[in-house]
Amino acid sequence: MQSLTPSSGVNLKSIIRKTSLPPGQTRFITGRVIKCGYQVDSANTVNTAGAPASYNSGHVGASRADWQSSCAILASKVVSQQPDTEKTGGAGNITAVNGHKTLDLVSIDNLPKALTITDLSPAPMHGSTLRVAYQGVPGAYSEAAAGKAYPNCEAIPCDQFEVAFQAVELWIADRAVLPVENSLGGSIHRNYDLLLRHRLHIVGEVQLPVHHCLLALPGVRKEYLTRVISHPQALAQCELTITKLGLNVAREAVDDTAGAAEYIAANNLRDTAAVASARAAELYGLQILAEGIQDDSSNVTRFVMLAREPIIPRMDRPFKTSIVFAHEGTGVLFKVLSAFAFRNISLTKIESRPHRNRPIRLVDDANVGTAKHFEYMFYVDFDASMADVRAQNALAEVQEFTSFLRVLGSYPMDMTPCCPSRDE
């Protein structure tokens, strides 16, 4: 897989430089803190017929004038500005560690800073370089997924999943690449909830093999470690291997894997290791104590690519469609599944999430009295394009006995083999 190389930071006031990039190079941006009171209403629309004919595949901004006007109004809600707090440590004179007189660490201040929810303000018109938002800091697996999905993109780090959604909605980014499930850890529930709350469309997917490494400051040996920090899922995916390495360490959870590596480098922590990628070690000046420490070599994370507008469904290649629906009454879920089964459409995923607007449903029964049931939203992926008549008829039938139905996207399937290769 093509590696990403960050360049120097760019002021968020100018957002993006209108310069072209040579093939294979990815550029990052940084920003000042801008507080913006923007919120997104829940999307309760029903879209079962795929993308309208006016939508252009791969094209963003069919209603750009309206978006720019809306963004200008939102920008007027800016209430304050404050400069980024300077970070210290990580690049100065450091006490010797196991014979090493100095540590040649990357200056944290020279790396791109993740956008926060207060940084969001409308971006000006931009050039042809595609800007892709992801959650985390440089070196995160989401950054690698963004580079795999859009090799020549300009990657924009965001500190939260919701910030990545809003970055696309406010034209700061053209796309967002966010994880939705892992082959070992399961679904990323937060992003399923955000898919329903925001009005973005799934336009593609990418599957990324995950190869964890144990990282520490140069000169630090494994027997000197007292704790290991990383994202909770990363720690869980490496639990057996960490034990086999003979490490008597405490496990502590942080927001993301690359953020753990950045934290160790910035604070010169000699008793702490991070579970992160090899790229994170390179970026933050850490050494790799052990490679491939995931318990299962077939560790794969699935990411979805999000845009403001859907793409036109096609029939010339395998497509996948994602929907979400709510139901009322008995036997509705069986009827929904039957609508696909009768048309020989394979379901690849079904996920239930609590219905936030109606968490509990009361059912009065003359025999047993009043019963309380949890209400759920169901997320379903199936192998068919919305251009397929079978899919159109299936959703038309589903809509008849569901109280809510929304098509999240119909998009090409990622057909690349997910072979666990450390060189990827």
Curated annotation (Swiss-Prot):
PANTHER family: PREPHENATE DEHYDRATASE P PROTEIN, PREPHENATE DEHYDRATASE-RELATED. Its main location: plastid. It is found in: Plastid, Chloroplast stroma. This is Arogenate dehydratase 1. Residues 1-52 form a transit peptide. Transmembrane segments: none annotated. It catalyses: L-arogenate + H(+) = L-phenylalanine + CO2 + H2O. It holds the Pfam family PDT. The gene is ADT1. Induction: Circadian-regulation with peak levels occurring at the end of the light period in flowers. Triggered by EOBI in flowers. Residues 321-412 form the ACT domain. Pathway: Amino-acid biosynthesis; L-phenylalanine biosynthesis; L-phenylalanine from L-arogenate: step 1/1. GO terms for biological process: circadian rhythm; L-phenylalanine biosynthetic process. CDD domains: ACT_CM-PDT, PBP2_Ct-PDT_like. Has no detectable prehenate dehydratase activity.
